[in-house]
């Protein structure tokens, strides 16, 4: 990574604002998945070990630019304190004199500021709000890859006002994605799932420019199958994108691999009657909700030959057990492959976790949307704003 790193900063005695991604699920006042908190710990510990005074800021959920008790950071503070093994002082604000006072009083541990999205200036990247956030600090570190595709005050505005650098997690995310996109060990197999071709058109184009094989599952495969002239029953199809799908298939030839069989049902619900049929025989009124066993085997063969794998998106309606087997089959194959594997997107990551395969993946991305935009070749505002290393 060519950006200035936290390693390049003189930290002793400095007040450092760290943008973390603590947008974690909370139920009944408890954090139910602390992965994102754990992934931020190396940067936090590094800063503390080098004598910095550290305050952390994150968004949580989607509050509408004003305080909402459901999205307070208190449960996150409690879990962070347990994981870090140091005191975490949670403030009920992100700005104002209280922040400066807390930094002056800080002897051990870290400060966690209140939810950045309690302020309307956050999502607008309001200059006055960014200046207020930056005021008490000497340095800024961005370790929130999952929010790097947002041009918000805590990802861009503050970085424009303070000497800024990337944290270890942001570095790691970019290094893995750069490795996949710029110098993959071959064969390079990309796997894409999810519902809509329209959401991933740029990603598909980008991956077809570098991957040896692109395996397409999830509901988006039905737009491709219909574009090939097949009947797809009541399956989800984006008719406006049939022309694009045809163009992509013609350009990719045999590098774009589609399902050969699918699991269909009359309704998308637990307990619905299901059938497994070849893609040429999807019944009228039935919808495809997962890839079938022959497709799992076909995808598996390609995956086991790979030396580099990028996987984003489920192969079916993963939340319903009857339509989860395709995603689980792909997860097991990726784990078995021994390839350098980068996995992103909520359902792909959930499948890996459910099967206990996290340790078998090279890198599990904390940012589904950010990783897709990066793969697509789009600039991530939270990364672009950081100075290049040679500028230091």
UniProtKB/Swiss-Prot annotation:
ATP binds at residues 200, 288, 319, 345-348. Its EC number is 2.7.2.3. It catalyses: (2R)-3-phosphoglycerate + ATP = (2R)-3-phospho-glyceroyl phosphate + ADP. GO terms for cellular component: cytosol. It is an enzyme of class 2 (transferase). GO terms for molecular function: ADP binding; ATP binding; phosphoglycerate kinase activity. InterPro entries: Phosphoglycerate_kinase, Phosphoglycerate_kinase_CS, Phosphoglycerate_kinase_N, Phosphoglycerate_kinase_sf. It comes from the Bacteria. The keyword Cell inner membrane does not apply. Disulfide bonds: none annotated. Substrate binds at residues 21-23, 36, 59-62, 117, 150. It holds the Pfam family PGK. The keyword Transmembrane helix does not apply. Its main location: cytoplasm. Pathway: Carbohydrate degradation; glycolysis; pyruvate from D-glyceraldehyde 3-phosphate: step 2/5. Belongs to the phosphoglycerate kinase family. Monomer. HAMAP family: Phosphoglyc_kinase. This is Phosphoglycerate kinase. The lineage of its organism: Bacteria, Bacillati, Actinomycetota, Rubrobacteria, Rubrobacterales.
């Amino acid at each position: 990574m060519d950006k200035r790193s936290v390693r390049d900063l003189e930290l002793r005695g400095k007040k450092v604002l760290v943008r973390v991604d603590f947008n974690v699920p909370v139920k009944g006042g408890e954090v139910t998945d602390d992965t994102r908190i754990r992934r931020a710990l190396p940067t936090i510990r590094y800063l503390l070990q080098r004598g910095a005074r550290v305050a952390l800021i994150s968004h949580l959920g989607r509050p509408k630019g004003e305080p909402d008790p459901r999205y307070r950071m208190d449960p996150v503070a409690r879990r962070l304190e347990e994981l870090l093994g140091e005191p975490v002082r949670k403030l009920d604000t992100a700005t104002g004199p209280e922040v400066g006072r807390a930094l002056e009083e800080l002897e051990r541990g870290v400060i966690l500021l209140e939810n950045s999205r309690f302020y309307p200036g956050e999502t607008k990247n309001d200059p006055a709000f960014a200046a207020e956030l930056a005021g008490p600090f000497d340095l800024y570190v961005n370790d929130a890859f999952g929010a790097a595709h947002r041009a918000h005050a805590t990802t861009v505005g503050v970085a424009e006002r303070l000497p800024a650098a990337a944290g270890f997690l942001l570095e790691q995310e970019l290094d893995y994605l750069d490795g996949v996109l710029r110098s993959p060990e071959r064969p390079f197999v990309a796997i894409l799932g999810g519902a809509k071709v329209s959401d991933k058109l740029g990603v598909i184009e980008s991956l077809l420019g570098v991957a040896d094989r692109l395996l397409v599952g999830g509901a988006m495969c039905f737009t491709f199958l219909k574009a090939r002239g097949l009947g797809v029953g009541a399956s989800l199809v984006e008719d406006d994108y049939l022309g694009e799908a045809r163009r992509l298939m013609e350009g990719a030839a045999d590098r774009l691999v589609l399902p050969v069989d699918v699991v269909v049902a009359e309704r998308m619900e637990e307990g619905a009657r299901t059938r497994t049929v070849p893609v040429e025989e999807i019944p009228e009124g039935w919808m495809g909700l997962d890839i079938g066993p022959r497709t799992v085997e076909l995808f598996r063969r390609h995956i086991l030959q790979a030396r580099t794998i990028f996987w984003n998106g489920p192969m079916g309606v993963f939340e319903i057990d009857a339509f989860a087997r395709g995603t689980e089959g792909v997860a097991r194959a990726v784990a078995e492959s021994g390839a350098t594997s980068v996995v992103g997107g909520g359902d792909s990551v959930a499948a890996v976790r459910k099967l206990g395969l996290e340790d078998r993946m090279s890198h599990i991305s904390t940012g589904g949307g950010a990783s897709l935009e990066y793969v697509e070749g789009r600039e991530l505002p939270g990364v672009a704003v950081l100075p290049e290393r040679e500028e230091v």
